[in-house]
Amino acid sequence: MKGHVTEIFNQLSTVYEKTVDKEGLYNTEYERPAMLNELPKDLSNKKILDAGCAAGWYTEQLIQRGATVVAIDISPEMVNATKRRVVGNVNVICMDLEAHMPFTDNTFDYIISSLTLHYLKDWKHTFQEIKRVLKPNGTLLFSVHHPFTDISWTKEKQYYSTELIIDNWNKDGKTYEVPFYRRPLQYIINTTSRYFLLEKIIEPQPTQTFKEYAPEKYEVLLKRPQFLIIKSTNSA
């Protein structure tokens, strides 16, 4: 699974640079505005970990807001894409979010993870590491697939399991088989609250620009949210 995810996102790195970061409505006009709305516009003197940086879109945005950013991703090609995007301005590391993080305790003011955690089967070790390297009262902000949408993929007879799903992404005339884990809402909420103080649960709404470009998909998102955003605090 892990090796397959790495290889798939190595292949997708160019696609992210050319299209997803500029034209992907579910990113540009749905998930990203809602995520950025939860962050201060001025992040000067703040140190932030971009956990699962992909091609570096969030990394660049955080730098523009004044933050000192460390970006990590499991895909070497995504790491290279991020380095091309933010030349010389950030430390970009190829590493697995399920491994020990090479940072000292209480390093970061914020940890941001955009649409990444659903590629991990078990969040416990990852959250233990995030809690360790996040400063007291620091913020963890992450987005994942919404379980209400993911349940439509299930091959199981019940909702409550954590299930490996294969999604087919059609990009630039090619189909990519992208594996992820579907999990119930209670897992997301309870696992997060075991390590952090829940501050806000956000079900993002698409922008009016999304509606202009894709009115039918816009209406679907108003009835069935695709992503879920969790904002929490590293309480003592």
Locate predicted features:
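Conserved class I S-adenosyl-L-methionine
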Residues: 1-43, 57-61, 78-81, 85, 139-168
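Class I SAM-dependent methyltransferase SAM/SAH-binding core
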Residues: 49-51, 55-99
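A short acidic, Gly/Pro-enriched loop at the edge of an enzyme's catalytic core
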Residues: 101-110
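A short SAM/SAH-binding and catalytic strip from SAM-dependent methyltransferases
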Residues: 109-124
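A short glycine-rich, Lys/Arg-flanked "PGG" loop and its adjoining helix->strand segment in the class I
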Residues: 124-139
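Acceptor-substrate binding/catalytic loop of class I
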Residues: 142-144, 148, 172-187
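Short alpha-helix
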Residues: 178-202
